[in-house]
Amino acid sequence: MAVYRLCVTTGSYLKAGTLDNIYATLVGTCGESPKQKLDRVGRDFATGSVQKYKVRCASELGEILLLRLHKERFAFFCKDPWYCSRICVTTPDGSVVHFPCYQWIDGYCTVELRPGTARTICQDALPLLLDHRKRELQARQECYRWKIYAPGFPRMVDVSSFEEMESDKKFALTKTAPCADQDDNSGNRYLPGFPMKVDIPSLLHMEPNIRYSATKTASLIFNALPASLGMKIRGLLDRKGSWKRLDDIRNIFWCHKTFTSEYVTEHWCEDSFFGYQYLNGVNPIMLHCLSSLPSKLPVTNDMVAPLLGPGTCLQTELERGHIFLADYWILAEAPVHCLNGRQQYVTAPLCLLWLNPQGVLLPLAIQLSQIPGPESPIFLPTDCELDWLLAKTWVRNSEFLVHENNTHFLCTHLLCEAFSMATLRQLPLCHPVYKLLLPHTRYTLQVNTIARATLLNPDGLVDKVTSIGRRGLIYLMSTGLAHFTYTDFCLPDSLRARGVLTIPNYHYRDDGLKIWAAIERFVSEIVSYYYPNDACVQQDSELQAWVGEIFAQAFLGRESSGFPSRLCTPGELVKYLTAIIFNCSAQHAAVNSGQHDFGAWMPNAPSSMRQPPPQTKGNTTMESYLETLPEVNTTCSNLLLFWLVSQEPKDQRPLGTYPDEHFTEEAPRQSIAAFQKCLAQISKDIRARNESLALPYAYLDPPLIENSVSI
């Protein structure tokens, strides 16, 4: 008689325990154990419990290959989900085999777990294990189906597949799903206290292993309801018309001020702060260094000489690499929307900036269209104060549109959703890349589903607050994806291509490069352990299918993007994985976490403009300026969004925090520890630097970076 000892850990999530009966079967190279009920005196599988059981066999089973968990009805009770964290099996000879699970087991079903040792498909020779990999991926591909949201968009998860799935029944992968414009919007309706419609049906069905935890859901609701209802009670969400005074905007979130939001309120109209935001604001990727001026921006030396001062000229500054351009060309043909029944306006400005001898980035000239001419004057710092302020505000509106739609939602949320989907569909649980990436996909499908149900849906928040509306959003994102490249995706390459490696006080760049290097070292150690040579990469059919699916579904097979459709060397794999992890974590933090800080003072980030851009100088008054800014209800609805997305709900997992132990080998565990130590040092350096800054930059402080796109 051989006795195997099982130590079963149930997760600590709310209602993670189960009343259902749990049975176990061990499968080894020499046979399998009888199906045996895991039962002991008292309550089994309670939330947070660690319990021990014995499985008896007539003889030893050899090397343990699989652990089958059978979940069946208990008495007359309804099915009860169970969150199994891990199971450790001690064999008769005393060796311990770890079986990571970390998933909800719903309904009455059988789940097969493999030992925690990561293995590529090339390392599996037994038909039993190869068949297990195949069946696991087939089941996941039936559960997680792709859907086309709009032409030119990265593909997304089809949440209707979760509604159709039952724990003991799977539906065909070939089932088609309609595009966004063909959806039945019967469930798209207003909820009390909220200013926009919500697509309720899409939120009701979410596969349990990708949905928010109860803690995170409660935290999100707790953040949203008081702020929204507070505005509703004060009548701000229903009040149309212009702001009477700029100072009135201060009172919207009087109880939700931060040090940075107050700093922005005091300094927003200063040229130095306008330039600062291109380096350390929420969209720090717009600047390109110029060696010559584009023909569409005919700025002359005489125009800017008063700002440049004696001893230099525009051509000299261009040659020195001190002139930079922010070009909003993508907005030139964006559709325009109506808000409160009134036509809104969009421009595609060109903003020229100069790095002065003191290392301060200053706006030098602004043209509010892509076509120069008499009706498109070039605004200068020497113009009338209100003319110059209005021109800068138009640029800030363009910043808002490009940042929210492309920098933020497209390049982090949507692309990371595609990475998550491909990982779930093409890599089995035992694959080393799956184990590496899974923590960086946590809650991404859920948060994007919420975004599509509240922001991108017809009459959602995008239609309620932006000058381009949902149609314009679709245009911007599809156009942005068509021009997005692998160089843009990889931080060091992007900084080099934009010529911004030497600008002083560029904290986003400095902190980002440190984090990139830390991730790269960590990933390199993991990859070198599992992929010692080129052949290991090239022969991993699952890895190649994963890369190919990302190329096809995220980047729509566009070869000009430069994204790989196949990986050939460990070095290529390291760079690719580093970029994915960085964008799922640090990049999202950099472009998301400061939205309330920089947007709470609405004139610094207006979501729409109600008057056409000025075609002459000298006509701007404070009254006309206020008439151009968004109306009261538009402002409040947008600031509500800023507040919510800047408040990371509870149940956070900072970058490098891996409480779910998917890797069980010593080498990757040591790499994780070294990664965490490196991040701790980066955090220490950032906090020391911030002590001497008038405006600290903390968005890339590792403890404040979430592992994944989860809000």
From Swiss-Prot:
Residues in Lipoxygenase domain copies: 119-711
The protein's required cofactors: Fe cation
Superkingdom classification of source: Eukaryota
PANTHER family given in the database record: LIPOXYGENASE
Reaction catalysed by this enzyme: a hydroperoxyeicosatetraenoate = a hydroxy-epoxy-eicosatetraenoate; a hydroperoxyeicosatetraenoate = an oxoeicosatetraenoate + H2O; (12R)-hydroperoxy-(5Z,8Z,10E,14Z)-eicosatetraenoate = (8R)-hydroxy-(11R,12R)-epoxy-(5Z,9E,14Z)-eicosatrienoate; (12S)-hydroperoxy-(5Z,8Z,10E,14Z)-eicosatetraenoate = (8R)-hydroxy-(11S,12S)-epoxy-(5Z,9E,14Z)-eicosatrienoate
Function text: Non-heme iron-containing lipoxygenase which is atypical in that it displays a prominent hydroperoxide isomerase activity and a reduced lipoxygenases activity. The hydroperoxide isomerase activity catalyzes the isomerization of hydroperoxides, derived from arachidonic and linoleic acid by ALOX12B, into hepoxilin-type epoxyalcohols and ketones. In presence of oxygen, oxygenates polyunsaturated fatty acids, including arachidonic acid, to produce fatty acid hydroperoxides.
Pathway(s) annotated for this protein in UniProt: Lipid metabolism; hydroperoxy eicosatetraenoic acid biosynthesis; Lipid metabolism; sphingolipid metabolism
Compartments it resides in: Cytoplasm
Gene Ontology MF term list: hydroperoxy icosatetraenoate dehydratase activity; hydroperoxy icosatetraenoate isomerase activity; intramolecular hydroxytransferase activity; iron ion binding; oxidoreductase activity, acting on single donors with incorporation of molecular oxygen, incorporation of two atoms of oxygen
GO biological process: arachidonate metabolic process; ceramide biosynthetic process; establishment of skin barrier; fat cell differentiation; hepoxilin biosynthetic process; linoleic acid metabolic process; lipid oxidation; lipoxygenase pathway
Entry's Gene Ontology cellular component terms: cytoplasm; membrane
Protein name: Hydroperoxide isomerase ALOXE3
Keyword set, alphabetical order: Cytoplasm, Dioxygenase, Fatty acid metabolism, Iron, Isomerase, Lipid metabolism, Lyase, Metal-binding, Oxidoreductase
Organism: Rattus norvegicus (Rat)
E.C. code: 4.2.1.152, 5.4.4.7
The record's free-text note on cofactor binding: Binds 1 Fe cation per subunit.
Pfam hit, one: Lipoxygenase
Family: Belongs to the lipoxygenase family.
Positions that bind Fe cation: H408, H413, H588, N592, I711
Domain PLAT: 2-119
